[in-house]
C-alpha cells in the first residue's frame, strides 16, 4: 500500500465513523472527568464489519518491527478490534478478564488463552485518554509473566496518556491524534454546519 492509498484509507475510516455516529460534537464528559466538545465512541463499529476491518488494518500497520507473538484488546470495545486483527493476520490473542469473582480457582484467572511466560504481547485499544485502562490491562498481563513493550491505538486524544504510558515503559503508537482526526473531518467529510463550526473552533485549541 502506498502512502497515498493509506491516507485515503485513513480519511475513509474517519468519514465512516462520522457517518455511523461514532464521532459526535457537543458537550461531553469523559470517564476521567475531563470535558470535551468531540466524543469518539467506537462501540457502534462492532455492528459495521467493513468499518471494523478498515480500522483493524490501520491499527495493525502500526505494529513494531520486533517480534510479538500475542495481542490483547483492552476490555471491552477493543476486544472486537483485537479479534479482527487476530483472525485477519493470524496472530494469537489472549483475553484479559475484567471482573474476577474469586469464588473458585478458575475465577481467579486474570488472562485467558494459550501463552507462555516471557512472551511479548501487544496491547490494542480504540481510544486513549488518561492511559489508565491500558495500564490496567498491561499490569494484568505482566502479572502472568508477559512482556508489554507497546500499545497500538486508533485515536490518541492528546490529554497526557502517551506520557503516562512512557513512564511505565510502554511506547504508544496511534493511527490518529485528535488534531489529525479533526483535520480529516474538516477537509474530507461533509459535516453538518453546527459540527463544522465546532470542529473549526476545536482545531484552534489543539
UniProtKB/Swiss-Prot annotation:
GO terms under biological process: 'de novo' UMP biosynthetic process; pyrimidine nucleobase biosynthetic process
Keywords annotated in UniProt: Glycosyltransferase, Magnesium, Pyrimidine biosynthesis, Transferase
Cofactor or coenzyme needed: Mg(2+)
GO molecular function, one term: orotate phosphoribosyltransferase activity
Pathway assignment: Pyrimidine metabolism; UMP biosynthesis via de novo pathway; UMP from orotate: step 1/2
Top-level taxon of the source organism: Bacteria
Catalytic activity: orotidine 5'-phosphate + diphosphate = orotate + 5-phospho-alpha-D-ribose 1-diphosphate
EC number: 2.4.2.10
InterPro entries attached to this UniProt entry: OPRT (IPR023031), PRibTrfase_dom (IPR000836), PRTase-like (IPR029057)
Record has Magnesium as a keyword: yes
Keyword check for Magnesium: yes
Ligand binding (5-phospho-alpha-D-ribose 1-diphosphate): 97-98, 101, 125-133
Binding site for orotate: 157
Subunit structure and binding partners: Homodimer.
Sequence similarity: Belongs to the purine/pyrimidine phosphoribosyltransferase family. PyrE subfamily.
Job of this protein: Catalyzes the transfer of a ribosyl phosphate group from 5-phosphoribose 1-diphosphate to orotate, leading to the formation of orotidine monophosphate (OMP).
NCBIfam families: PRK13809.1
Protein name as it appears in the record: Orotate phosphoribosyltransferase
Gene name as annotated: pyrE
Amino acid at each position: 500500500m502506498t502512502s497515498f492509498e493509506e491516507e485515503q484509507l485513513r480519511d475513509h475510516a474517519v468519514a465512516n465513523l462520522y457517518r455511523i455516529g461514532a464521532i459526535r460534537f457537543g458537550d461531553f464528559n469523559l470517564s476521567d472527568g475531563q470535558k470535551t466538545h468531540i466524543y469518539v465512541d467506537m462501540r457502534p463499529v462492532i455492528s459495521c464489519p467493513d468499518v471494523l476491518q478498515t480500522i483493524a488494518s490501520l491499527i495493525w500497520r502500526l505494529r513494531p518491527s520486533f517480534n510479538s507473538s500475542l495481542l490483547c484488546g483492552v476490555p471491552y470495545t477493543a476486544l472486537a478490534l483485537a479479534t479482527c486483527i487476530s483472525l485477519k493476520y493470524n496472530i494469537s490473542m489472549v483475553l484479559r478478564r475484567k471482573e474476577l469473582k474469586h469464588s473458585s480457582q478458575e475465577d481467579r484467572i486474570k488472562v485467558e488463552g494459550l501463552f507462555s511466560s516471557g512472551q511479548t504481547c501487544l496491547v490494542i485499544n480504540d481510544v486513549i485518554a488518561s492511559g489508565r485502562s491500558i495500564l490496567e490491562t498491561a499490569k494484568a498481563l505482566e502479572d502472568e509473566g508477559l512482556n508489554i513493550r507497546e500499545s497500538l491505538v486508533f485515536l490518541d486524544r492528546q490529554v497526557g496518556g502517551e506520557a503516562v504510558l512512557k513512564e511505565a515503559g510502554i511506547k504508544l503508537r496511534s493511527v490518529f491524534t485528535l488534531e489529525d482526526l479533526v483535520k480529516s473531518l474538516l477537509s474530507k467529510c461533509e459535516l453538518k454546519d453546527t459540527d463544522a463550526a465546532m470542529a473549526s473552533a476545536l482545531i484552534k485549541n489543539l
